[in-house]
Amino acid sequence: AAATKGKGDLMSGGSRLTDMDGNRLNHHTGISCMSQYNVVDRGSVVVIDKAFNIEDAALFGCAVMTGVGAVINTARIRPGDSVAIIGLGGVGLNGIIGSKLAGAETIIAIDIDPSKFSRAEELGATHCFDSRNNDMVEEIRDLTNGGVDYAIDLAGVIQAMDTAYQIIRYGGSVVTAGLSPINTQFSFNHSDLVAQ
C-alpha cells in the first residue's frame, strides 16, 4: 500500500475516476477521504457505532491510529522499554499515550515547542526535551545509559530523523510515521548505521 501513496493510486492500483474532461484523478494517500462521500478499499473502513460522537471519532482516523499504531504495532514497545517520541502534535501525543499503554518505563517527549510539554506529561511522558537544546542528545544518552530502545519520529522533518538516530542505544530501533514532503531526502553515515 505504501507504494501507491506517492503515485496517487488506489490500493488495488490505478484510478477509477476522471474529471469532466476525462483526465485521470489521483488519490491522496490511497484513501482520499477529504470529502463528504468517499470510495475506499474495504481494508480502510471501520464501522462506527451510531451512539459514538462523530467529532470524537474523527481523531481515530489519523492521530490515534498513527501515533498509537507506530508504538504498539510497528515498534512493538514492551513493558520496561525506553522510548523517545519526537514531535508532539496530535500524532506524537498519541504516541505518548501508546507508549504508556505498552508499559514503557521511560517515555521521552521531544519537540521544538516547550508549551507542549505539560500536555505530554499529563499523557504519560516521564521527561521532556526542547530539540533546540544543543546538549539534548548527550542529556538523553546520559539519562538512558547510552540511548533509548526506540526513537519514534512523528514530526516528519529531517531534524527529527537526525535526532532519532543520535539518541538510540546500540541495537536500538528507529521508527518513523511522520509525513515529510514527497521529495524529502534523508541521509545518514552508513558506518553509523552498521555500528548501531
Report each predicted region and the residues it spans.
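Glycine-rich phosphate/adenylate-binding loop and adjacent beta-alpha elements
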Residues: 1-45
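A generic alpha-to-beta junction signature in SAM-dependent methyltransferases
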Residues: 77, 144, 155, 167-169
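Mid-domain Rossmann-like dinucleotide-binding core that forms the NAD(H)/NADP(H) cofactor-binding site
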Residues: 37, 43-44, 49-134, 138-139, ...
